[in-house]
């Protein structure tokens, strides 16, 4: 969209908005306001529902990326002539709704789980990068005026908890926890990444 704004006279704005509209209308779970991770319009992928084409999971990072995309698009769009008022309203409503839905699943620690709506599931875990994405979306949403100032505390809580989880191990190691597989289907093995000053070592934990 930024390219379209600066160099292409907004010619492909309609296509950009159409893609957002498709996701909003087809990938949102109406029961909890979360978005499914993926959709296969052919209904042929092994992971998809054969009726809807949707995956089964609401994945934290995917939800965060979508929140960022909505917000960053709103930030960069040129709507000075009000030609795209309806589209901007669509994106704003989707962003605010997604944030409010995600806040229902924020853990008391301040972070979110990898599979957002299964916080109590065995081997699900509080995920660092996705929680950072959500903190970014919350803070930028507040700064741009799409979210109330009170939402800042949710972002700060997520950031504070991640800082607390960066632990110094003795005097040689730094441990970054909660860096394991990108899918909850791969939880049979977990990786603990121990970063030594001289080099990186990987210790596999059963």
Regions found by a protein language model. Name each.
Residues 47-68, 85-87, 91, 106, ...:
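Solvent-exposed loop and edge beta-strand segments that line ligand/cofactor-binding
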Residues 14-36, 41-46, 92-110, 154-172:
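Long, well-ordered core segments of solenoidal/helical folds
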Residues 1-9, 65-87, 132-147, 206:
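Well-ordered alpha-helical scaffold segments within catalytic/enzyme domains
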